[in-house]
């Protein structure tokens, strides 16, 4: 009789636990990878000295402040040449930054020496750009990048996923296709927001559309953010990959944005908020062959604006 009571209690607890687990899953049915960035044009409407004296300084100093103040904050920054300038011109801050890189909170986004145009340069030039960047990252930080991170380049050729895969990279992200004037893939400006991109030789990397990199929030709980929910529901994965921060002149995300991500991580809304590195989504879906739900695109990702511009 006692054994029957023990079994009954155990079953009740198991069923209750399953119910709680289902409730928790229902609450966290949407996932948001929040990818901070401070995209910095090496040279655009200013000279290199302005880049070094103002924009590189703002980027390293502001983000060191945020990393010290907000324990959940993760910062992503691309372009080996900017890291080299940090080392040369701001050595004290550079050494501080290296500690956060080691901890995984300052993330080397992208893998190249320069986040440059990828249409005009030859395949060899693109590979050399990656090799030069990876060599610097390996020598300086003991790490390498794992993705192509190009929030502000003007179109992406069919060779890019092939180049990336043969360089050992696993993912690609941008937000630029939203700048198109006209739809390109049916009624959309891009084939999908998260999926796999197949290159000319059949090699694949994961693709993520980051939306506008200048997005800001003002001290809100992002776990309850309806826009993130809607964006996530555009994919079969119920997941959104979302840039936030600033563009062109470096710097950092706003305080209100960083606080919003922190609140979202601790929040109890339907969105699971992740303060993410630029490659975390891609790593979470490895190996890609185990995820048949990922759509596949086999072709070019072209622009119909900025057609005569080269980006450096």
Go through each PLM region and give its residues.
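N-terminal secretory signal peptides that target proteins for export/translocation
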Residues: 1-2
């Amino acid at each position: 009789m006692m054994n029957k009571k023990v079994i009954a209690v155990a079953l009740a607890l198991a069923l209750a636990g399953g119910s709680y687990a289902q409730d928790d899953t229902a609450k966290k049915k949407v996932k948001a990878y929040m990818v901070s960035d401070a995209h910095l044009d090496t040279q655009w409407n200013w000279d290199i000295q302005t880049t070094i004296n103002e924009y590189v300084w703002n980027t390293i100093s502001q983000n060191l402040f945020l990393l010290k103040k907000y324990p959940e904050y993760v910062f992503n920054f691309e372009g080996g040449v900017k890291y080299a300038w940090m080392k040369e011109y701001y050595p004290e801050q550079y050494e501080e930054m290296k500690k956060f890189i080691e901890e995984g909170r300052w993330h080397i986004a992208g893998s190249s020496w320069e986040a440059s145009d990828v249409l005009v340069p030859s395949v060899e030039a693109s590979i050399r750009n990656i090799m030069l960047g990876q060599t610097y990252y390996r020598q300086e930080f003991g790490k390498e990048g794992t993705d192509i991170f190009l929030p502000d380049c003007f179109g992406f050729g069919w060779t890019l996923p092939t180049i990336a895969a043969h360089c050992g990279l696993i993912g690609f992200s941008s937000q630029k296709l939203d700048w198109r004037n006209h739809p390109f893939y049916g009624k959309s400006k891009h084939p999908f927001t998260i999926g796999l991109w197949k290159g000319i030789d059949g090699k694949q990397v994961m693709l993520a559309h980051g939306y506008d990199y200048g997005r800001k929030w003002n001290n809100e709980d992002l776990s309850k953010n309806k826009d993130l929910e809607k964006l996530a529901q555009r994919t079969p994965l119920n997941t959104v990959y979302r840039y936030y921060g600033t563009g062109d002149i470096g710097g950092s995300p706003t305080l209100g944005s960083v606080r919003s991500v922190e609140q979202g991580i601790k929040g109890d809304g339907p969105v699971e908020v992740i303060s993410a590195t630029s490659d975390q989504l891609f790593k979470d879906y490895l190996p890609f062959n185990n995820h048949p739900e990922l759509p596949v695109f086999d072709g070019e990702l072209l622009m119909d604006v900025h057609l005569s511009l080269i980006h450096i």
